[in-house]
From Swiss-Prot:
Record protein name field: GMP synthase [glutamine-hydrolyzing]
EC code: 6.3.5.2
Assembly, per entry: Homodimer.
Record-level Gene Ontology MF annotations: ATP binding; GMP synthase activity
Source species of the chain: Lactococcus lactis subsp. cremoris (strain SK11)
Record-annotated Glutamine amidotransferase type-1 domain positions: 8-198
Gene coding for it: guaA
Role, per record: Catalyzes the synthesis of GMP from XMP.
Pathway note: Purine metabolism; GMP biosynthesis; GMP from XMP (L-Gln route): step 1/1
Catalytic activity: XMP + L-glutamine + ATP + H2O = GMP + L-glutamate + AMP + diphosphate + 2 H(+)
One Pfam family hit: NAD_synthase
Length: 513
């Protein structure tokens, strides 16, 4: 965020798998928070002007050569600092304490015993369950610190130096297994750091509109509109900020869900008044893909062709200086931190040409996915768009296994519509993270109307998840599955068998290819 007057707590990234959760929990309290590289200097932090700092956990040992370090001057800024797990060990080590390998590693839920009163733990019980995940531990604390909590394997499970506003905890308050972790983080943010706790989507909208207007001035902005949640929210937000200075290009490649293209035009172009150039490129894409079966080849062709179509349309416009994108905070974290690891490449349609000389506008690049949905709701967008299912850039083309044909594509489009309709009617659409159908490219024998059939087998994939990184198959009611199956085989041509995918992630991925 460019506004240095905004109350914010920064989280220095030391590689913990829970880093994003720390920022999310602080935001849930009503205080803006963002991840930063552990390489940030005290001078840079002073310029950012946060009200507090959190040092995250991480896999390193502070005494190992090459372990992630910290600018020691950060502890001299006078700002409240909370060290979590590795962050606590690093703070203790840098300030004169001792850290050693634990004789017995501590992983999982453990009881934390508070030994004296601490503002950090105000309103929490004397004994509480917390999540421990560490192989090292502090064996001697720095001068000026005192112990406020212990666990069976950590005599220094919680320490503090109230004169310098420095706090350390060996456990992870950001995860739900630490039952009172949110209260502890709230105490740190609101009481120790003095935050007002008034950060909200309404404030975010006002700030972004102000930022966009200052950056863009009277110039023009181009947006690649996919119809998904992120680009749709960007479009509505920018429309509110700069009106007719925004032009959106919507490429219909022919692999969208049933009725999706019409809904985009009616809702975003109609109700919200976006200036949308719709490009009907179904034939252009299909001609390139007919008969192809390799999923990576399909993705590459669709990505490249999208770029070419977008480039063709963009070149017809004059005086465009800015390109808007729906980049989320998770994308920034994955690509921009020193500790990030990419678990799986995303399905998003390929990047835009390098020679397109635009300045970027990414108004969502400090938001998580759930916050984008909240923003869309605050902007008055309908649930059908705000709560739209995650959808891969290549669309239904990668939900057709084997060679791509119009016939197989239509089986997926029609069956997907039935699945979405029945899930919605059952009231489960907010409980299931993602659900769709796949043409497996397998044919089997069936009997319909006393006639032998030899038609396609479709798979239903439905998962539950918190963040999409791991997932379980959704245990949908049998009567609902039966109803969906019956409707599909009766209403969708060339289909005579339905199977249900009961594989979790891992070992499977969400999409089939």
């Amino acid at each position: 965020m460019s506004d240095t007057t905004l109350e914010k707590i920064i989280v220095l990234d030391y590689g913990s798998q829970y880093n994003q959760l720390i920022a999310r929990r602080i935001r849930e309290i009503g205080v803006f928070s963002e991840l930063m590289s552990h390489k940030v200097t005290a001078k840079e932090i002073r310029e950012i002007n946060p009200i507090g700092i959190i040092l995250s956990g991480g896999p390193n040992s502070v005494y190992d050569e090459g372990s992630f370090d910290i600018d020691p001057e950060i502890f001299e800024l006078g700002l409240p600092v909370l060290g979590i797990c590795y962050g606590m060990q690093l703070m203790s080590y840098k300030l004169g304490g001792m850290v050693e390998a634990a004789g017995e590693r501590e992983y999982g839920v453990a009881p934390l015993q508070l030994t004296e009163k601490s503002a950090l733990f105000a309103g929490t019980p004397e004994v509480q369950d917390v999540l421990m995940s560490h192989g090292d531990r502090v064996t001697a604390i720095p001068e000026g610190f005192h112990v406020v909590g212990t666990s069976p394997n950590s005599p220094f499970a919680a320490v503090e130096n109230t004169e310098r506003n420095l706090y350390g905890i060996q456990f992870h308050p950001e995860v739900r297994h630490s039952v009172h972790g949110t209260e502890m983080l709230r105490n740190f943010a609101l009481n120790t750091c003095g935050a007002k706790g008034n950060w909200s989507m309404e404030n975010f909208i006002d700030m972004q509109i102000k930022d966009v207007r200052e950056k863009v001035g009277d110039k023009k902005v181009l947006l690649g509109l996919s119809g998904g949640v992120d680009s749709s929210v960007v479009g509505v937000l920018l429309q509110r900020a700069i009106g007719d200075q925004l032009t959106s290009i919507f490429v219909d490649h022919g692999f969208l869900r049933k009725g999706e293209a019409d809904q985009v035009m009616e809702t975003l172009g109609g109700k919200f008044g976006l200036n949308i150039i719709k490009v009907d490129a179904q034939k252009r894409f299909m001609d390139k893909l007919v008969g192809l079966s390799d999923p990576e080849t399909k993705r590459k062709i669709i990505g490249n062709e999208f770029v070419y179509v977008f480039d063709d349309e963009a070149n017809k416009l004059e005086g465009v200086d800015f390109l808007a994108q729906g980049t989320l905070y998770t994308d920034v974290i994955e690509s921009g931190t020193d500790t990030a690891q990419t678990i799986k490449s995303h399905h998003n349609v390929g990047g835009l040409p390098e020679d397109m000389q635009f300045q970027l506008i990414e108004p969502l690049n400090t938001l998580f996915k759930d916050e984008v949905r909240a923003l869309g709701t605050q902007l008055g967008m309908p649930d059908e768009i705000v709560w739209r299912q995650p959808f891969p850039g290549p669309g239904l083309a990668i939900r057709v296994l084997g060679d791509l044909t119009e016939e197989k594509l239509e089986t997926v489009r029609e069956s997907d519509a039935i699945l979405r309709e029945e899930i919605a009617a059952s009231g489960l659409e907010r409980d299931v993270w993602q659900y769709f159908t796949v043409n497996t490219d397998v044919k089997s024998v069936g009997v319909m109307g006393d006639q032998r059939t030899y038609d396609y087998t479709l798979a239903i994939r439905a998962i539950t998840s918190i963040d999409g990184m791991t997932a379980d198959f959704a245990q949908l009611p049998w009567d609902l599955l039966q109803k969906i199956s019956k409707r599909i085989v009766n209403e969708v041509d060339h289909v005579n068998r339905i199977v249900y995918d009961i594989t979790s992630k891992p070992p499977a991925t969400v999409e089939w290819q």
